[in-house]
């Protein structure tokens, strides 16, 4: 198998934000289904570090995939200005918002090879439906057919990930802090993340099934590398029909259910204890309030008696004077 020029693509958050902004701006003025731009970055051995990007005017015919337009002059002028700011950032490939590969991507990639021999295509999904990375990286390779027909250009998938420098990480943390919903509890958030993860897994399994069905019906050629990788995945799956696996699963499930039951029981006892304490506190408060009222009445009665005694004394003094 031919060794690829790049084995991993690292996309920075700044690139993702720029692409989303590009898509939102174009979406307001036109009806384009996708936008196209240029990726800037640097190579570190077989790892491509994509640190910046800029948009490029692009248009295509919805009915005829062979009809498309990309502004070369704009691309060269923008790259010249970016090069003055940071000479280390070079053209390393291009992006579009997909969300899937298009038939004319090979032709566009051949054009981008004028500026970068090992041009990399990164598809950035600006509206992801499932949990996971919004990026898919590809590099063009020569595909050799088993039937002896001439080779053709095709895309080979490359591993991609999101990476950032320290300054970018701080900015992303601030953004996440602003949009994070503090009212959502930890448990519900964990369950939501698991549900999203299962939905993502389900979509991947559906893609695998669809691919295998198309290969079986002859709609797609057999790619032995993909078949071998799928076989490795299937070999890693546990045999759920084994008695030992079933027993271990039941034991673990029972242990978890016991923990849940004990937690619910403890929660009920604590709630009952709090209810009793609250009732006692209310009773003491009512008793104290009643005692204070009685003391207040008694004090007022004593004050009246003292005033009466004083008035009687004054009357007697007046009589004696007379």
From Swiss-Prot:
UniProt cross-references to Gene3D superfamilies, sorted A to Z: Cytidine Deaminase, domain 2
Region (Disordered): 281-322
GO biological process, one term: proteasome-mediated ubiquitin-dependent protein catabolic process
Domain MPN positions: 9-144
Positions where N6-acetyllysine occurs in the chain: 204, 214, 314-315
Keywords, comma-separated and alphabetical: Acetylation, Isopeptide bond, Proteasome, Ubl conjugation
GO molecular function: metallopeptidase activity; protein homodimerization activity
CDD domains: MPN_RPN7_8 (cd08062)
Pfam families recorded: JAB, MitMem_reg
Crosslink (Glycyl lysine isopeptide (Lys-Gly) (interchain with G-Cter in ubiquitin)) position: 180
InterPro entries: EIF3F/CSN6-like_C, JAMM/MPN+_dom, MPN, MPN_RPN7_8
Family in the record: Belongs to the peptidase M67A family.
Name of the featured protein: 26S proteasome non-ATPase regulatory subunit 7
Gene name per UniProt: PSMD7
């Amino acid at each position: 198998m031919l060794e690829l020029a790049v084995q991993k693509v690292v996309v920075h958050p700044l690139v993702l934000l720029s692409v989303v902004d590009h898509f939102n701006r174009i979406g307001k003025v036109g009806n384009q289904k996708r936008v196209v731009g240029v990726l800037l970055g640097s190579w570190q051995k077989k790892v491509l570090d994509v640190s910046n990007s800029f948009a490029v005017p692009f248009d295509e015919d919805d009915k005829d995939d062979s009809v498309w337009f990309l502004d070369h002059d704009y691309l060269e002028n923008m790259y010249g200005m970016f090069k003055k700011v940071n000479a280390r950032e070079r053209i390393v490939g291009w992006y579009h918002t997909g969300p899937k590969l298009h038939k004319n991507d090979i032709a566009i990639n051949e054009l981008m090879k004028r500026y970068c021999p090992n041009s990399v295509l990164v598809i950035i999904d600006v509206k992801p439906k499932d949990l996971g990375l919004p990026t898919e990286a590809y590099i063009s390779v020569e595909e050799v057919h088993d039937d002896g027909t001439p080779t053709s250009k095709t895309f080979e998938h490359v591993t991609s990930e999101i990476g950032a420098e320290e300054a970018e990480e701080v900015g992303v943390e601030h953004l996440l802090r602003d949009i994070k919903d503090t009212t959502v509890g930890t448990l519900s958030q964990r369950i939501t993340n698991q549900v999203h993860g299962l939905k993502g897994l389900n979509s991947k399994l559906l893609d695998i099934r669809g691919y295998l069905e198309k290969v079986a019906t002859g709609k797609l050629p057999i790619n032995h590398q993909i078949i071998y990788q799928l076989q490795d995945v299937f070999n890693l799956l546990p045999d759920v029909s084994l008695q030992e696996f079933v027993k271990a699963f039941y034991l673990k499930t029972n242990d978890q259910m016991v923990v849940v039951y004990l937690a619910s029981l403890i929660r009920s006892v604590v709630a009952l204890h709090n209810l009793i304490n609250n009732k006692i506190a209310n009773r003491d408060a009512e008793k104290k309030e009643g005692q204070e009222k009685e003391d207040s009445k008694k004090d007022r009665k004593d004050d009246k008696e003292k005033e009466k005694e004083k008035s009687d004394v004054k009357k007697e003094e007046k009589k004696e004077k007379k």
